[in-house]
Amino acid sequence: MSEDAAAKRRARQTVNNLVLALIASLGIMLAIILIVPRDDSNRIQSVDYQGIAAEAQASSGKQIVAPELPAGWWSNSARWSPKPADGVQNWYAGFVGPKNQYIGLTQAFGINPTWLAFQLKNSAKTGTQAVGNYTWDIYEATEPSDPPKTKDFMMVLNYNDHDTALIYGVAKPQDFVEIATAIQVKLMERTK
């Protein structure tokens, strides 16, 4: 065998070995991808907001509203703030719908105009929505965001002189009405 033929053979072996190594690496990578289990469940766990509301009500003596959610909805967060920095005790619960909608509920006790103005900053009253025996004020962002932010649309219910319920989020108006209806049912239970 001549030196030229041997050099060509060695050059072909290098290319062949490179291709074989690449194929083997891709095969191993594909096997790992297929073998490794993937968790496709929701990473955000459901929260027992009604249990947290019951504890908050027992410890505070306040009438905490924990509405029954429509089918497919669940709570991703709930908390009672008995001594917040702004001085307004409040109950918060976040709700997630079947199409990934989000509606937050803040129920505040002993509010003052400053607290309410802070909650409604960058919003303007655009109308009202009658829900059962209550009329909710609708506030929308003066400069809507794209994508929408959670407080670009809010419904506000003032009741008992200094108590307020706010619902806000990213959902269709009908979703807000459903949650407001569930809140109204709980508020009516309190007055019986």
Residue ranges and their predicted role:
Residues 51-150:
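Short, solvent-exposed recognition patches
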Residues 25, 31, 39, 104-108, ...:
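Functionally constrained cores in energy, signaling, and assembly domains
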Residues 1-77, 81:
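Charge-rich, low-complexity N-terminal segments
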Residues 33, 126-192:
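A short, solvent-exposed beta-edge/loop patch
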Residues 1-5, 17, 33-37, 48, ...:
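Generic ordered-secondary-structure signal
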